[in-house]
């Protein structure tokens, strides 16, 4: 691969973002860094066959989380699907390190990207309400959650976060690339898969 770069439209070197695990679908760059849309950094499905699900909708995201779709469920990938549980007092302590809103009553997703990652959420508590923008900010408030592609459920004093993936989800999924490599796909195939519209070009 010496002297090779990923080019877009033959003249621009692509900004090859990547994440640890997409969870099954990568994310549009505009929903993560709120920057200009890039054609080669749009959400793509990890599996060979795209699903007919809109992961920005919670009902479809739940179906997705209940599946093993994408990245071929690599044994080393502990973040493809995950679940985190907190007692009420634990969650209160975690959230109030960042937001001074008292006892947490609800956490609601106001906007999700194409991979189901939340990029706008509202936290409601006994002492106030805070709207948070940005998937990384949301994850940081929640004790550095694996990703913001999660659904929240609340039981009797117990909160459960069920999610997919690890990281922002933009660009190549490292776990997905490992899966494709194990299927004898070469690096050019993998790059085109995760950065649509690009070509691997030798420049020296």
What is each of the regions a protein language model found here?
Residues 1-204:
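Conserved, single-site charged/polar hotspot
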């Amino acid at each position: 691969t010496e002297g090779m770069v990923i080019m877009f439209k033959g003249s621009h070197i692509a900004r090859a973002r990547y994440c640890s695990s997409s969870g099954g679908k990568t994310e549009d760059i505009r929903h993560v860094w709120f920057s200009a849309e890039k054609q080669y950094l749009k959400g793509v499905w990890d599996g060979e066959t795209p699903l007919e699900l809109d992961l920005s909708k919670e009902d479809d995201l739940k179906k997705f989380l209940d599946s093993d779709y994408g990245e071929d469920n690599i044994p080393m990938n502990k973040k493809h699907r995950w679940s985190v549980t907190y007692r009420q007092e634990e969650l209160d302590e975690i959230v109030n390190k960042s937001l001074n809103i008292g006892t947490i009553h609800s956490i609601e997703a106001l906007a999700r990207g194409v991979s189901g990652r939340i990029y706008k959420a509202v936290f409601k508590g006994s002492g106030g309400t805070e709207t948070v923008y940005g998937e990384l900010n949301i994850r940081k408030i929640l004790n550095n959650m694996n990703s913001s592609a999660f659904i929240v459920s609340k039981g009797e004093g117990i909160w459960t976060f069920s999610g997919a993936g690890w990281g922002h989800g933009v660009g190549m999924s490292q776990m997905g690339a490992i899966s494709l490599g194990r299927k004898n796909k070469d690096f050019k195939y993998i790059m085109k898969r995760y950065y649509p519209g690009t070509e691997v070009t030798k420049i020296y």
